[in-house]
Amino acid sequence: MSTSAIIYSGYNMCKFYDGTKLLSLQDLNGQRPEIYICTTNRTGGKTTFFGKLCVKKFLNNGEKFCLLYRYNYELDGIADKFFKDIGRLFFPKYNMTSERRASGIFHELYIVENGCDNKVSCGYAITLNSADQIKKYSHLFSDVQRIMFDEFQSESCHYCPDEIKKFISVHTSIARGAGEQIRYVPVYMLSN
């Protein structure tokens, strides 16, 4: 994983936050960063922009995504939690479902066109607290192209023990495979 990160507090007068500028920036060495940190006020539109980006990249290019959380209980109702707003706003022809995998260690996300029975896997939802188990299932995540970590800053300072080590472990587990020892898998870290 690249050690560089781009931090940008984006605000514009559009209806929704636009992270296009953030994603176009390079680090001090002129390289494309692997970690993008985006902070704005609550309801600034960060989650909407990056969630829409993940789904749009899947629908247009088949690029799967990963939603990253801290604790397993946060995966309950994940499809509705992630897709309810962006689905209504940007993807009204689609619905999202999820299925627990590996005894609930992670969830596989599926996108379904309304009126169709054919669900298509579009990504995964995993947790930092399951970093050791995720490592054992890393081969399943070799098709992930991007990671979205919403609310990476806890308002109550409730973090996982060794959270940074777990974050690096999860990213490494996802960024290997697909014929590569290490792949470029950007992480969008969003918070207030």
List PLM regions with ranges.
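Phosphate/NTP-binding elements of NTP-utilizing enzymes
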Residues: 2-192
